[in-house]
UniProtKB/Swiss-Prot annotation:
Assembly and interaction partners: Component of the fork protection complex (FPC) consisting of TOF1 and CSM3.
Lineage: Eukaryota, Fungi, Dikarya, Ascomycota, Saccharomycotina
Protein name per its UniProtKB record: Chromosome segregation in meiosis protein 3
Keywords from the UniProt entry: Cell cycle, DNA damage, DNA repair, DNA replication inhibitor, Meiosis, Nucleus
Keyword Nucleus found: yes
Gene: CSM3
């Protein structure tokens, strides 16, 4: 009995009976690893395919906006013999084909939304749009023009309010030059530096004030008692514009116009936040009362770029 047990132990300790590595192919030595065979236990990280985005570089390429400027007047056929629906379909078809060729991943509606967002936020595209206005009007920006722009910026706000409409066009040009300097300084955080939208915003706000029978001069001349104004501002901080009467709104707008031109360094943080809240409320109020100025009644989801149209009107188009 003991001899049989000893023979079993000797057989188990034999080198030929040692279990082999299951990952090594049959008939191969486990100490020799073939470099061409992948390790089945290794974890390989799957590389993520880079996502293609619609950027300013793609919009400014040969197939982007320069293609539209070069070929739109050739491809778009507007005939007086056709009705407005057919002419509009011809225009939309051109832009649909162009959008699919430039960025086929997005649908046309999504493409238009992306273009609108990138065009307003990307500094390179903003400078490109300004250069289009500049070339269309034949403006030249030399050193003398920039110096003139700096001198105009040093003028007091009272002088700027009394500038006539004929003298406003050089100011617009100098503000574009200021935008160009801001691009070189890489300061894109303040969207109010974009005079295209700033001028159009003031224009739209002026039209709403005319409808109410009040202009900015009346608002600036309103001098309420300081106690009433402080109480009104405190009420606005707590509950916002809810329940405000028309004369109270005028007082708030007058206070906003007086403090909007002040430097932020001379104001408290609470006043800066209050100005931002008032500007946001004012913009929403103007948008709500100004929908009938849209060119397309009912409008689609994008609406019309009214800011750009107002800027073109300001520049004399």
């Amino acid at each position: 009995m003991d001899q049989d047990f000893d023979s079993l132990l000797l057989g188990f300790n034999d080198s030929d009976s040692v279990q082999k590595d299951p990952t090594v192919p049959n008939g191969l030595d486990g100490s020799v690893v073939d470099p061409t065979i992948a390790d089945p236990t290794a974890i390989t990280a799957r590389k993520r395919r880079p996502q293609v985005k619609l950027t300013a570089e793609k919009l400014l390429s040969d197939k982007g906006l320069p293609y539209v400027l070069k070929n739109a007047h050739k491809r778009i056929r507007i005939s007086s013999k056709k009705n407005s629906y057919d002419n509009l379909s011809n225009i939309i078809q051109f832009y649909q084909l162009w959008a699919h060729e430039l960025f086929p991943k997005a649908k046309f509606k999504d493409f238009m939304k992306i273009c609108q967002t990138v065009g307003k936020t990307d500094p390179v595209l903003r400078e490109y749009r300004v250069s289009l206005f500049r070339d269309e009007m034949g403006m030249s920006f030399d050193v003398g023009t920039r110096e003139t722009g700096q001198d105009l910026e040093r003028q007091s706000p009272m002088v700027e309010e009394h500038v006539t409409s004929a003298e406003e066009r050089p100011i617009v040009a100098d503000s574009f030059a200021q935008d160009k300097r801001n691009v070189n300084n890489v300061d894109y955080d303040n969207d109010e530096d974009d005079d295209i939208y700033h001028l159009s915003y003031r224009n739209r706000r002026g039209r709403v004030l005319d409808e109410r029978g009040n202009n900015e001069t009346v608002l600036n001349n309103v001098v309420p008692p300081k106690e009433d104004l402080d109480a009104l501002l405190k009420t606005f901080r707590v509950q916002g514009p809810v329940g405000l009467e028309e004369n109270e709104k005028k007082l708030l707008l007058g206070w906003l116009d007086a403090h909007r031109k002040m430097e932020k360094g001379s104001m408290t943080e609470e006043d800066v936040q209050l100005i931002q809240s008032l500007e946001e409320w004012e913009m929403n109020d103007i948008e709500g009362q100004h929908t009938h100025y849209d060119l397309l009644p009912g409008g689609d989801e994008f609406g019309v770029d009214q800011d750009e149209l107002d800027a073109m009107k300001e520049m004399g188009f």
